[in-house]
Amino acid sequence: MTQQTFTQYDFKPFLIDAVRELRFTEPTGIQQKIFPVVKKGVSVIGQSQTGSGKTHAYLLPTLNRINASREEVQLVITAPTRELAQQIYEEIVKLTKFCAEDQMITARCLIGGTDKQRSIEKLKKQPHIVVGTPGRIKDLVEEQALFVHKANTIIVDEADLMLDMGFIHDVDKIAARMPKNLQMLVFSATIPQKLKPFLKKYMENPEHIHINPKQVAAGNIEHYLVPSKHRNKIDLVHKMLLQFKPYLAVVFTNTKKMADQVADGLMERGLKVGRIHGDLSPRDRKKMMKQIRDLEFQYIVATDLAARGIDIQGISHVINYQPPSDLDFFVHRVARTARAGHSGIAVTIYDPANEEALDSLEKQRHIEFKHVDLRGDEWADLGERRRRKSRKKPNDELDVMATKVIKKPKKVKPNYKRKLATERDKVKRKYSNKKR
């Protein structure tokens, strides 16, 4: 089954062997769309969620055309975080495992926080593939230790995170050193307006491939919807965390400033809290990730973009401090829990202003929320969120009908409004009784 489905894309034998060992049964949705387009040499903007098979969607077809006899860089892959760059590099190692001895494909992982001089030494023999963070790759190119002028393909992974962390300028400088007929493959959960000038500069008529997020209502995730009711939201989150007693909980905020406010507020209330956002220095980020992996934190506050480039294991609870401004981020957030067969709880705190976004999540993403509130130490069922509005609707219809029957007189007298309202109320009561 594996061989049949992947061989239809004319992948070389070493890739088919690797796919078989990785136990891939059939190409995912994004892979089926990306493989033929990349093969044609077309530039691509790909949008898909975590866990969609995106990394292999771009690795398989680009590795397939590496010419091992040419000792020069043929493929550049940029990632916004060291952790993600390392993950991609490890996948390349797995996929090139079955190369013939005289056809070995070489790759280097070039990231900040490592000995740059040592990297320069290793680059005396240029690899076929470089994967790394934009800053380190750019530095090595500018120091003429790394030569990318013959590489026809560049992959920009998690592009919106690149933008958020200020790395797009570095990617721009790398791409500027590459051939004019460059194939650029950009992968991003969203395409922010500020990213578009960069895309326009390097991509002529790119293929836009968008895979809709999977239905996240399925599986083992319970979705709680909690009204803020003008309460102190940090107090509310604090109470939730104490009530849940999570293995590991992540609180998502929409901005870096808000992440700091929530983290500081929870720490003031006695919780030991980790934080992940784009303003952390590389050293602080590395330290934070080590602490998280060593289970030093039970609670983490994060922004969408900074957390997306990191694989955090064992998340039992996700709390949305507010619904995300982009609904695709909701999928990325809640998909971090209930992995590998485990169950999870995703809580979304909302204000009346969020009603429209919640409607979209229910209709477009098929989320089934439990409308609840934390009262004391117990969760109370609040019933349907839309109950009040649906109750009001018949009255609206009666008002319209009564206004048509009893019209405002052309010549008005004092107190006419009160008399008009009384007469219309009589009509509404009469009509209402008939309906019963």
From Swiss-Prot:
Leading EC class = hydrolase
Tell me where the sequence motif Q motif sits in this chain: 4-32
Question: What keywords does the record list, in alphabetical order?
Answer: ATP-binding, Cytoplasm, Helicase, Hydrolase, Nucleotide-binding, RNA-binding, Stress response
- GO MF annotation: an example: RNA helicase activity
The conditions that induce or repress this protein are given as: Induced at 10 degrees Celsius.
Catalytic reaction annotation = ATP + H2O = ADP + phosphate + H(+)
Q: Name one GO biological process term.
A: RNA catabolic process
- SUPFAM superfamilies assigned to the protein according to its UniProt record, in alphabetical order: P-loop containing nucleoside triphosphate hydrolases
What does UniProt give as GO cellular component? cytosol
Q: Where is this motif: DEAD box?
A: 157-160
Per UniProt, residues of the Helicase C-terminal domain are 240-388
Bias class Basic residues marks the residues at 405-419, 427-436
UniProt-listed Enzyme Commission number(s): 3.6.4.13
Task: Write out the function statement from the record.
Answer: Probable DEAD-box RNA helicase. May work in conjunction with the cold shock proteins to ensure proper initiation of transcription at low and optimal temperatures. Unwinds dsRNA in both 5'- and 3'-directions and shows RNA-dependent ATPase activity. Probably has a somewhat redundant function with CshA, as cshA can partially complement the growth effects of a cshB deletion.
The name under which this protein is listed is DEAD-box ATP-dependent RNA helicase CshB
Q: What is the lineage of its organism?
A: Bacteria, Bacillati, Bacillota, Bacilli, Bacillales
Quote the gene name from the UniProt entry. Answer: cshB
